[in-house]
Amino acid sequence: MVREKVTVSTRTLQWKCVESRVDNKRLCYGRFILSPLIKGQADTIGIAMRRALLGEIEGTCITRAKSEKIPHEYSTIVGIQESVHEILMNLKEIVLRSNLYGTRGAFICARGPGYVTAQDIISPPSVEIVDNTQHIARLMEPIDLCIGLQIERNRGYSIKRPNNFQDGSYPIDAVFMPVRNANHSIHSYGNGNERQEILFLEIWTNGSLTPKEALHEASRNLIDLFIPFLHAEEETLHLEYNQHKSTLPPLTFHDRLAKLRKNKKEIELKYIFIDQLELPPRIYNCLKRSNIHTLLDLLNKSQKDLMKIEDFRIEDVKQLLGILEKHFTID
């Protein structure tokens, strides 16, 4: 556990992590402060941050399981201690960390007797198992257990439907939220009209990301939600803004596509996903909303095409070109 003495600045707004600990692989805790704030601001920020932490951060879960010769979810399998339902509930609890987009496949193939744990899950490289010791099943006899899995990254909840059983597979209720809990409290200090506030924010996560990472992601998501309001104001000043705005050379993306193909002949561009480019969240979200999922999708767009994307700015195009040049050395 890490603790720091709380110090309050009376001049510059600042935040600090004052306590951080890892209780176990699936429970991390962090306590943060933001100060100094004017009276009322701490509650405004605290409420918004708590809602963003609990509802706006994506997580990764197992959402479907498939195995042969299972008549229904509540059946039992000879040689396995747990029922099918209990195995599905254990799979629901597996904590995963990933940067994938959409769904991916994984599988379990184990032979008894012995315990089947999370370390027996064979997953894509983009998916990391947080706690390999999580229990799935116990095989009492020398039998094989093979289960196909579907892994998905999303936010909030996913509740299985009665008509959602397909091809002998079983949907699993998923809780995508990596933040287990978040609380905020306020400490006031000062006298009279000069009273100020310190916001204390406590975050518990499931280990798929740290409380600090959760705080950063929630903050970015809140900023993204407010960008349309800023964009609307910018449009009213569009003509004045354009007089001072720098521009890029026109339509450079097709040239870069040709050079990238020349420099990286061995790479299939359609198999390079933009998830791998470490894009800023705002740019990444804009591209995803426009169905740009791979490097090939991106490089087939002109600068004019990109500028038509909602909330996409000339500065974003510049930053995107810089990232491409960094990753692929485009001259």
Curated annotation (Swiss-Prot):
What is the protein name stated in its UniProt record? DNA-directed RNA polymerase subunit alpha
**GO cellular component entries:** chloroplast; DNA-directed RNA polymerase complex; mitochondrion
Among the GO molecular function terms of this UniProt record, one is: DNA binding
Briefly state the protein's biological role. DNA-dependent RNA polymerase catalyzes the transcription of DNA into RNA using the four ribonucleoside triphosphates as substrates.
What quaternary structure, including any partners, is listed in this protein's UniProt entry? In plastids the minimal PEP RNA polymerase catalytic core is composed of four subunits: alpha, beta, beta', and beta''. When a (nuclear-encoded) sigma factor is associated with the core the holoenzyme is formed, which can initiate transcription.
Q: Which domain of life is it from?
A: Eukaryota
Q: Which UniProt keywords apply?
A: Chloroplast, DNA-directed RNA polymerase, Nucleotidyltransferase, Plastid, Transcription, Transferase
Known InterPro entries for this protein?
DNA-dir_RNA_pol_insert (IPR011262), DNA-dir_RNA_pol_RpoA/D/Rpb3 (IPR011263), DNA-dir_RpoA (IPR011773), RBP11-like (IPR036603), RNAP_asu_C (IPR011260), RNApol_insert_sf (IPR036643)
Report the subcellular localization.
Plastid, Chloroplast
In residue numbers, the region (Alpha C-terminal domain (alpha-CTD)) covers 265-331
Which species?
Vitis vinifera (Grape)
- SMART domains given for it? RPOLD
What SUPFAM superfamilies does the entry give?
C-terminal domain of RNA polymerase alpha subunit (SSF47789), Insert subdomain of RNA polymerase alpha subunit (SSF56553), RBP11-like subunits of RNA polymerase (SSF55257)
Entry's free-text remark on domains: The N-terminal domain is essential for RNAP assembly and basal transcription, whereas the C-terminal domain is involved in interaction with transcriptional regulators and with upstream promoter elements.
Transmembrane segments annotated in the record for this chain: none
In the record, the note on similarity to other proteins reads:
Belongs to the RNA polymerase alpha chain family.
**UniProt enzyme class:** transferase
Q: What catalytic activity does the UniProt entry give for this protein?
A: RNA(n) + a ribonucleoside 5'-triphosphate = RNA(n+1) + diphosphate
Q: Which EC numbers does the record give?
A: 2.7.7.6
Principal localization?
A: plastid
Instruction: Recall the taxonomic lineage recorded for the source organism.
Output: Eukaryota, Viridiplantae, Streptophyta, Embryophyta, Tracheophyta
Gene Ontology terms describing biological process: DNA-templated transcription
